[in-house]
UniProtKB/Swiss-Prot annotation:
GO terms for biological process: terpenoid biosynthetic process. Gene3D superfamilies: NAD(P)-binding Rossmann-like Domain (3.40.50.720), UDP-galactose 4-epimerase, domain 1 (3.90.25.10). This is NmrA-like family domain-containing oxidoreductase flvB. InterPro entries: NAD(P)-bd_dom_sf, NmrA-like, NmrA-type_oxidoreductase.
Amino acid sequence: MRYLITGATGGLGGHILEYFIAQIPFSDFAASSSSPENRSRFESRGVNFRHLDYENPTTLNRALHDVENLLFISTNANVIDVEKVKRQHRNVVEAARKANVKHVWYTSLPFGGLTNDSEVSVQRAHLATEKMLKESGLTFTCIREGIYVEGFPLFLNWYPETTLLTLPRDGEIAFTSRVELAVCTARLMIQGGFENRIVLLTAGETITAKELVSVINETTGRRVELRYVSPDEFVDAGPRNDRGGKSRAFFETLVSLWESAASGELRTMDGLMAEILGRDPIPPRDAVRQLLVENRDHTWHQMYAKK
């Protein structure tokens, strides 16, 4: 099997799968999911399916048999549980090594750009995985994917009903279209190369929280106000006032994300994405405006705590 796409029921993985369906013979790739119940969803479209669960080494060993290129989508485990992420990723790397996978394409995060200096907990988990890959002897490419522009409500903790937003800090973020990231990731895999390298895919412009609020107001006619509060006040008030029922740990994580943005960790941009697309990526301001024109109440699934 030339290509195995993990996370095929998710956002990024799903878009990558659609690119493969449109561009590659069906016999050359397979989709995988942690839920065997998804088999019919793919096979009804003629797509090969393999059950693969990051928590279950048996499924990993079986699914990775004869795979040449593995798209290793980082786990969707709660980003607050860094140790769980590391454990699951270690399972994948070990199984890929045992299966002699020829090339692992890993989706990482862009905190710190192309450096390894970020102290943000979610990025430390990715850095640990990148280190595992380097030490495994596998051929790999770590793709640091830009922050999804579609998820901007999560960074602001903005709901359609919100009239007053509070944040602990502000900073520039190179928010990037998830659809464009998927296209570029798929093209990287298909064209090959970039062996044992870390690459960065981002939009060519940045945007701040203050500017995001302006776009919300300009596009939807709302009058959302943004105030800056201390990190302690933000964390204390967040769980009490949150419509989505998110935990205190979420707001602690959000503080660290905005502190990293304020220090410049998310403003690094790279020209590789434009090179792969053959044009400039959609700027974050335009992307947010487009999302809100399509749905003035645009939201993001992680805004609501899982029950």
